[in-house]
């Protein structure tokens, strides 16, 4: 199995101790490739879902990182507190909240607004509380626990934390780093079925997103950088509104790209998707030609055509060539560019009797 051709995700169960970047390094060493990155950094003492992007999937790290995260954690209150009080303060911290990142964080310490979608009490024993939280990406759970303790008047802190999902990647897909290394070793010996079963393709990242299936006729234009227009759509799977992210896939269910919807699914017109990621490979040089009318006069990689000896531009009205316009046939003066830009000098050979202005600066350049 050629590991350099892997383009997808593997969900690892990060243990306590190593940093997320250390896990990146180990996966690179195991596979022998460089294109590896994790989605959503975990602190060294936090365990759970650490999704690794491999190959082309590395380009989707920022997209998947936008997805909500889920955690199970343990919080300790400094004073006695009842279950009813815990539920009350958990409800207070559900919805949009203000957060100040901790002192030891990778981002600037400025007040931010984050969304907590749900915060549930699972179990309570004495001053210890087991909870489940689903929150917006970038929410600090340690800070959340500290803030709850402060507002309750009891004081408190996070004791333990485990991430259970990042977007569509959940812990039921997790494998340990040791298991992953063993699967790779088997794949090197030709037994790659187990490894293939645990590598999720790039479309899996958009399992919960609305999707647009494009016509084959539109694929070439997209590969060359075009956005998606209404005429290139074959099927729309799911509802979306203007400004939401959508996934664009081929008729063969391969990921073509992803971008922001420029209209709603109920009112399709003109430009539909503004791509920020395209995964199609363009045919190098194909259709990249210089034309006069409908006739191709310069194909990529071939010798220079006699009619395009100069830079591209408008048709020269004197010569009939397509190139930069040389201007009128007789011009008394010309403007020199560069450091003497703006000064007007006579053409060379004009008025050699000394009646013209003296030239400066660029005579010998």
Swiss-Prot record:
Residues 209-285 form the PUA domain. Its EC number is 5.4.99.25. It is an enzyme of class 5 (isomerase). Keywords: Isomerase, tRNA processing. It comes from the Archaea. Residues 300-365 are annotated as: Disordered. The keyword tRNA processing applies. Gene3D superfamilies: Pseudouridine synthase, PUA domain. Pfam families: PUA, TruB_C_2, TruB_N. Could be responsible for synthesis of pseudouridine from uracil-55 in the psi GC loop of transfer RNAs. Belongs to the pseudouridine synthase TruB family. Type 2 subfamily. This is Probable tRNA pseudouridine synthase B.
